[in-house]
Structures are given as C-alpha cells and as structure tokens.
Amino acid sequence: IPQGAVVCDLGSGQGLTSMFLAKEYGFTVYAADLWSDPEENRKFFDEMGLSRTQIIPVKADAAALPFEKEFFDAVVSTDSYNYFGRDEKYLDEKLLPFVKSGGYIYIAIPGMKKDCHEHLPAELLLSWTPEQLDYMHDAAYWRDMVSRCRGAEVLSVSEMESNEEVWDDWLRQENEYAVGDRKAMEAGGGKYLNFIAIVLRKK
C-alpha cells in the first residue's frame, strides 16, 4: 500500500484497526461500520490523539457503500467480512468498484480448520447456534468463494500463523461476546477453529 494511501477499514467496529493503520502507517482511514456510532468513535479517536483528517468514521452498509468509485487504495476488513461477503457476487458488485486498479483487499476472519456444518461438534454448540456457525468456514470454502470474482486476482488464502494467539487475546476480553465464546473454547472447541487471511488485488 503506497505511503499516504486512502484506506477503508470495512466493518471497523470501534475502530481499533483503523487507529493502527493511521498511527503506524500514516494512512488516511475511513472507519466504515453499520452498527457502531460514528460520533462515539470520533470521541474515541479524539481521545487517542488522532485528527479528523487521519480517521473519518462513517456509518455504512457493506452492501451499499457511500463512497466515490475507485476512491480507495486498499480495503482492510478484520473479523467482519464473513458476515457480508458470503455471496459470490459481493466482491465484483459491492466492493471492488470502490477500489483503484491495482489496489489491495486484506481480509482476516475467524474460520474452521475444516468445514463441519453437517455434523457440528458438541463443543462448538456450547457457545454458538448452527446459524451463527454458518458464518464460519474453512480456507477451501473462502478460496472457492473469492476465486469466482472476475475483477480481482487472488494472491493468497491461508490459515493465520497467529491463530492461537488471536483466539487467546479475544477470549481475555470482558465483552459479552468474548465471555460467551469461552464455554466452547474451554471445552476444546479450539481444535476445530482458526483464523483465515485473504489477500486480493484488483485487476
């Protein structure tokens, strides 16, 4: 990603990834999220010493992004793409139009080591319903999904090396979702789960 790039943090939540991208790399970041309050995020960014030109919080639906075409040098999506990107047309129709030619899309999502939706392990059902687990798939599923995209080159789809570290960090959080996930992981559900990294480049 070039220095001074304009980057979309898609599904940004409270904007922690946005802050990292702005502080560590000097990018101009649009923190786009449907469920968080842009004003609350703005207060948080102000408290963290980030200017209003460094991070711009935006309330946005991932399926109807409110930006100019070819606006972004790159898109980063952490722990959210699996909720809206499971439609094979999503990349071509809903996301890539807003990315410049040659721009990168970086995705990191929770997944499964091997899809097991036909016979869900009891350990996983301690924390999640079958409907919730339908948002989690293995690398083969995601490789097939993004490979159907006509407008981007698939550079890599792989299990993240930091898998256990990422899960441990998540489970230490005290928010209600992390607390709810502990039952499954404490029962050994982690042996079925991973984190998946996807890198694409717009043609």
Briefly describe each language-model feature range.
Residues 156-203:
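Conserved Class I S-adenosyl-L-methionine
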Residues 89-104:
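A short glycine-rich, Lys/Arg-flanked "PGG" loop and its adjoining helix->strand segment in the class I
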Residues 63-75:
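A short acidic, Gly/Pro-enriched loop at the edge of an enzyme's catalytic core
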Residues 134-150:
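Short alpha-helix
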Residues 1-6:
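Short helix-loop-beta connector
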Residues 110-132:
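Short, glycine-/aromatic-enriched active-site segment of Class I SAM-dependent methyltransferases
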Residues 8, 14-64:
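Class I SAM-dependent methyltransferase SAM/SAH-binding core
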Residues 74-87:
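A short SAM/SAH-binding and catalytic strip from SAM-dependent methyltransferases
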